Swiss-Prot record:
Places the protein is found: Cytoplasm, Cytosol
Record-linked HAMAP family: 3_HAO
Keyword Oxidoreductase: yes
Record: residues binding substrate: 53, 95, 105
Cofactors: Fe(2+)
Annotated region described as Domain A (catalytic), given as residue ranges: 1-160
Pathway assigned to this chain's UniProt record: Cofactor biosynthesis; NAD(+) biosynthesis; quinolinate from L-kynurenine: step 3/3
Region named Domain B: 178-282
Name of the featured protein: 3-hydroxyanthranilate 3,4-dioxygenase
Domain of life, per lineage: Eukaryota
General function of this protein: Catalyzes the oxidative ring opening of 3-hydroxyanthranilate to 2-amino-3-carboxymuconate semialdehyde, which spontaneously cyclizes to quinolinate.
Linker as annotated region, ranges: 161-177
Pfam families referenced in this protein's UniProt entry, alphabetically: 3-HAO
């Protein structure tokens, strides 16, 4: 049974999970993974996945360390800012105390692999890496980290010449990442356009992340091909799932499961974020 969740209240009720050693809590863990992450959490490992990740800083700032075209780079995401990370870019989130960030990623396709990588200190040279099919990153990381900390590479800080280089299942992205932007400033700038067009995309159609701002209006019944997460930012709306009608007030959210028929009616003055991730054909 679908249920509306007030985001602010949910964060307050789950504060304990945003502290070490856990530092995160999944609100939804289906086709779309909707998670909130806290800190402090400083790390050396870099994660690589084929899909995109969408970041939004709810409270406080964070630093996302990435390797862009062979060069280390820090992406600073401030409170209230949004950032879309392309797939196939090594990244390492650095989070601080008293911060909370919202992160979206999707369930992996059967053909996809994730990588966990460490670099030689201050260098783009790979020190250690492993590739695996990601089902539950939280539990799968521990044995890989344990193997790394007992390895020659960790003890010497240099690659092991006797260790064959891992074969990468795909090439890294050569895309240059975007600059983080203030979500509220974006809303203010596009408010008239949202009212006139009824909906405006944040990132366009050439990304697998479909993040769309909806104003007042109606979305007729259709089937969600993937999970759709709705966050009612202003005003009210009503989502119909079968015979069930759910009212969303300001701050409420709702996950519409994949393959579900639904319709959505938004009152005048409504502003809502709809987020889904549809894997792009390779």
């Amino acid at each position: 049974m679908a249920m509306a969740i007030n985001v602010k209240k949910w964060i307050e009720e789950n504060t304990e999970y945003f502290l070490p050693p856990v530092c995160n809590k999944l609100m939804h863990n289906q086709q779309l993974k909707v998670m909130f992450v806290g800190g402090p959490n400083q790390r050396k490992d870099y994660h690589i996945e084929e899909g995109e990740e969408l970041f939004y800083q709810v409270e406080g700032d964070m630093c996302l360390k990435i390797v862009e075209n062979g060069k280390h780079k820090d992406v600073h995401i401030k409170q209230g800012e949004m950032f879309l990370l392309p797939g196939r870019i090594p990244h390492s989130p650095q989070r601080y105390a008293d911060t909370v960030g919202l992160v979206f990623e999707r369930r992996r396709l059967d053909t996809e692999k994730d990588g966990l990588r460490f670099y030689v200190e201050g260098s783009p040279e790979v020190l250690f890496e492993q590739w695996f099919y990601c089902e539950d990153l939280g539990t799968q990381l521990a044995p890989i980290m344990k193997e790394f900390f007992s390895s020659k590479q960790y003890k010497s800080g240099k690659p092991d010449p006797d260790q064959p280089k891992a074969k990468m299942p795909f090439c890294l992205s050569t895309e240059q990442v975007m600059e983080p932007f203030s979500f509220q400033h974006w809303l203010n700038k596009h408010r008239l356009e949202i009212i006139q067009k009824k909906c405006v995309s944040l990132f366009g159609d050439d990304h697998e992340t479909k993040a769309v701002i909806y104003g007042g209006g109606e979305s007729k019944q259709s089937k969600a091909q993937t999970d759709v997460w709705i966050w009612q930012l202003e005003g009210t709306s009503h989502v119909t799932l079968g015979n069930e009608v759910l009212k969303l007030g300001s701050g409420d959210s709702l996950l519409v499961p994949e393959e579900t028929l639904f319709s959505w009616t938004r009152e005048d003055g409504s502003i809502a974020l709809s987020t889904s991730q549809v894997p792009l054909p390779m």
